[in-house]
């Protein structure tokens, strides 16, 4: 059976340091089969430049009409079997969140 894949979506517009903290909490995961899709509405605060170079992070910048439009746009970029939305400033509680989630999904 193939390993479950996750798409973690973060939508933002000028999020400041919150974006990096959210992305870092995902990068700290022990489970490795995920992508991070950052859908940016046109930030000018330099927050995108703070993101580390990592092949699991993909950034898409395109104007949107608000958070829900941004979420809908982001869905066209995801490739994972399961999608999780995180707001800027949200953190995954510990480094095993995706591991536990994958275990639950595999039992279904």
Regions found by a protein language model. Name each.
Residues 1-28:
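N-proximal low-complexity "stem/linker" segments adjacent to membrane-targeting elements
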């Amino acid at each position: 059976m193939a390993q479950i894949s996750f798409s973690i979506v973060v939508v933002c517009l000028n999020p400041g340091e919150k974006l990096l903290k959210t992305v870092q909490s995902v990068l700290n995961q022990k489970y490795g089969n995920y992508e991070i899709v950052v859908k940016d509405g046109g930030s000018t605060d330099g927050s995108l430049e703070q993101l580390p170079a990592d092949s699991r992070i993909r950034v898409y910048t395109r104007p949107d009409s608000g958070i829900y439009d941004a979420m809908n746009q982001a869905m066209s970029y995801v490739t994972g079997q399961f999608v999780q939305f995180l707001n800027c400033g949200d953190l995954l509680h510990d480094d095993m969140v995706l591991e536990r989630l994958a275990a639950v999904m595999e039992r279904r």
